[in-house]
Amino acid sequence: MNFERVKREEADTVLKLYRSLLGTPYCVWTEEYPSEKEVEFDLSRDALFCMRDDAGNIAGVISIDDDPNVECLTCWSETMVPSAEVSRVGVCQEFQNQGIAGKLLKGVMEELKKRGYQAVHLLVAKDNVKALRSYDKLNFENVGEC
């Protein structure tokens, strides 16, 4: 598996991956979100990454988000700046439970370090035990609920 930036011509593949996860356990996404708009926004900022299998297929995706509504939450550390939001983590169902989410998180954190970020934050549904387990393994700290 390799961590790479998603190519612009793969936008439809990413959107199909998002759609394939609708209705699965712990997924709070809808038909309206994430949409082509979010995929294009992420691609325009070189902020959409993936894990690829040995055949080059996308196994999972992750993005670096830029949402002012999330940035203004008061729970984030004011000493760890600049910080970035990690968002839209999704793993194809056939690749789930193989550590792909953890690899995506590690890869994006390395990318953020190269870009000069000091910290990472994210939002997750409090009942999404699979995601919470991945974040716990990487020593993420729960700083609040909203």
Feature map (PLM): residue ranges:
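A short beta-loop-alpha structural element at the N-terminal edge
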Residues: 2-16
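Acetyl-CoA-dependent GNAT
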Residues: 8, 21-88, 92, 105-106
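Short alpha-helical
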Residues: 9-13, 34, 129-130
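Conserved acetyl-CoA-binding loop of GNAT-fold acetyltransferases
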Residues: 19, 136-146
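Conserved acetyl-CoA-binding loop-helix of GNAT-fold acetyltransferases
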Residues: 91, 97-110, 133-137
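Conserved GNAT acetyl-CoA-binding A-motif
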Residues: 105, 112-123
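Conserved beta-strand-loop-alpha-helix junction that forms the acyl-donor binding cleft
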Residues: 122-132
